[in-house]
Amino acid sequence: MIRPVSGLFILLASILPLLASPRASADDRPYDVLRHNYAPYCTPGDDLAFPMKIWGLAKDQHTFWRGSRDLLFTWVKNHARDWLDDKDAYLVTHGDLHLGNIGTYVREGQLGATSFGPVDFDDTAHLPFQVELLQGLITIRLSARQNDIDLSGPRREEIAHALYDSYRKAIASDKSTHDLVSDERQITKFIDQAQKHTYDKTLGKFTDDTGHFLRYVQTRHAQEKGLVPKEILRPAMDRADDMAKSLAQAIERSPAARAAFRYSDVATMRHSIKDVVLRTRLESVGSQGLKKYLVLLDKPLKGLDMDVVMYVKQEIPSAAERAGAIPMDPRSPGQRCAEDMDVLTNPSAYLNCWCDIGKESYWVSFKEPWSDEIELENVRNYPKLLEMTRVWGSVAGAMHRQQGSAIAAAILQRLNRPELFDQLRHRSTLYMATLDREYADFMSDPRARAEAAKAQAKLDAAKAQVTAEANAR
C-alpha cells in the first residue's frame, strides 16, 4: 500500500544507495564502478535486473558507451575540471544525447501529432554545455567506428567542424528544432514515416485479443526463425493497486494530463486496469535492469475510443550525480526527469508526468506508435554520418538555446574562442583511448561474464518457450 511521502524522503531513498559505501574511485575497474553506482537500484536476485544490464553492455563497444555514462562522468570529473568550474556555462543538459536518443515524439495538442528533437531524459543534469558537446563528438566518432566508416585524412576534422558549426548556428538561431533539420533528407523521410501509424499498432504489439498483455513481443518471422524475443513481459498484477495510486498521483500533478484523461481518481483508475506487466526490452541499455511497468487501461484518453498502454518507468539519480561530477539534485529522480524534459523539448510532449511509489521514483507516459528514434544501422556511409552530425548539433543547440538569451550569449562567447574547439577534439581522443581500455577490461572481467551468463540463461529459456509455443500452434 502506498502512503504519502515527502519529496525529501524520496530524495534520501534515491541517494542512500550511493552513500552506503565509499564512492567508486577513478582507479576502480569498470565493473566495480557500475556495480557500486547502478546495482543498488536493481532488484536483488532478479537475473533480468543488474545481470541484464551487464549483458547489454557486453554487446559491443558502442553499446557499452551508451550504457556506461558513469564511467564518462568519472573521467570528466578528473580530466575536465576547468569546464566543471565554469559556472556561467551551466544549464540543463540531456546527459545522454547519442543518436538513438534523437527522434520523433508525440507533442502537445491533437493526439498523434509529432515533433522532432531529443527523447529519453533519464540522465538530465545541470552541467556545462561543453560536456554535452564532448559527448556529441564522442558519439559521432564511435558511430563511425561501429559502422566501419572511415574518418581518416580530413574527415575527422570535417566531422568535428560540422558538429561545432551546426551547434553554434542553432544557438544563434530562433528556429525550432524541426525547422533546423528540415533540409536533411534522411530526417524528412523519418518524420513522415512516423506519422503514418494508428494506435492499433501499439495494442497489436503488446496485447492479445482478451485484454491482456502478451508474454513476449516478437514478430512472427522471428518466431519462425527461433530467435530470442525482443521484449519479455512478466505478469505484475500484484502491483495494480500501486499503479492505480501512482497514475492518479502523476495525472493530478500535470494540467495537460488532467485535460487528456477521462478519469484520474484512484478508484476509477484501479477499476480500469486490465493488466500490468514488468517489461524487459532487450535493445535497452542505458536504463536496462530498472523497473519498467506497462499498464493496460480501459479507454482512458479523450478522443481515443480504445484501450491505452501506460508506461511507468523507474528513474534514479543521473549518471553525472552517481559519478560525483555534480551534487545530487534536490528533486526526486522522476520529478527531475519530467521537469527537465519540459525544459528541453519545444513543443512540450503530449504526456509527461512523474510519481513516487514507496521509496522509488518514476516517470509516467504512454506507449504509442508515433515516437521513433534514429537507428544507427541506417547511418551506413560518410555522407549520412555527416548529415547525422549536423542533426545532432542542431538538436543540442536548439535544446540549449531555448533556456534563455543569457545562456545563449554565454555559450556563443565561449564557442567563439578557438581553444574550445581544440579542447573538444583533444578530449574526445583522450576519452576514446580510455574507453578502449575500459571496454577491454570489462569484457575480460570474469565477474561481468558471470553476471551476463545469468541473464543469457533467462533469455535462452524465453527463446525455448517461444519456440515451443510456436511449434504447438
Where are these regions (language model features)?
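N-terminal secretory signal peptides that target proteins for export/translocation
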Residues: M1-V5
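Conserved ATP-binding subdomain of kinase catalytic cores across diverse folds
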Residues: A24-D47, G56-G95, L99-H197, Y263-E451, ...
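Acidic catalytic cores of enzymes that act on phosphate-bearing nucleotides/polynucleotides
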Residues: K201-K274, R279-T280, S284-V285, L296
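Bacterial N-terminal signal peptides
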Residues: G7-L18
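Flexible, solvent-exposed coil segments and beta strand-coil junctions
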Residues: P51-M52
